[in-house]
Amino acid sequence: MIENVRKFSRKNDKVVEQIIDQDVVMINHMILPKGEALPEHKANSNVFMMTVKGKVTLKLNDQNPQVYDSGHILEIPHNTLMNVSNQHDELLELFVVKAPGPKAYGR
């Protein structure tokens, strides 16, 4: 086979998993039930956050929190302070693409 095949979790519990980690790209998959959040952190590359299911509450730097439902791709610049959470009843599922991959950023 020419292609590399990777699987991602299909659960109803909290999941934060790294699917691909290469110099050119990092792809993470996350599932957050209601009330769950990621630790506050700064974007370590250019981030493209894709909401697949549910609604994400996203607070960037000093901005007020914004809510985005499924079907959105959010582009977040490198070094932006991020607060990501699920404050809604529906399970939140997202993919996060970082390009270039953080280990190659700034080389």
Name each model-derived stretch:
Residues 14, 27, 46:
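Short coil/loop residues immediately preceding or within conserved phosphate-binding loops
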Residues 17-19, 30, 37-43, 60, ...:
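Short histidine-centered beta-strand/loop micro-motifs
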Residues 24, 63, 89-90:
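Short strand-connecting beta-turns/loops that link adjacent beta-strands
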Residues 31-33, 43-57, 97:
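Short, conserved beta-strand element in jelly-roll/cupin
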Residues 63-78:
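Short acidic-glycine-tyrosine-enriched beta hairpin
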Residues 78-102:
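Ligand-binding loop in jelly-roll beta-barrel domains
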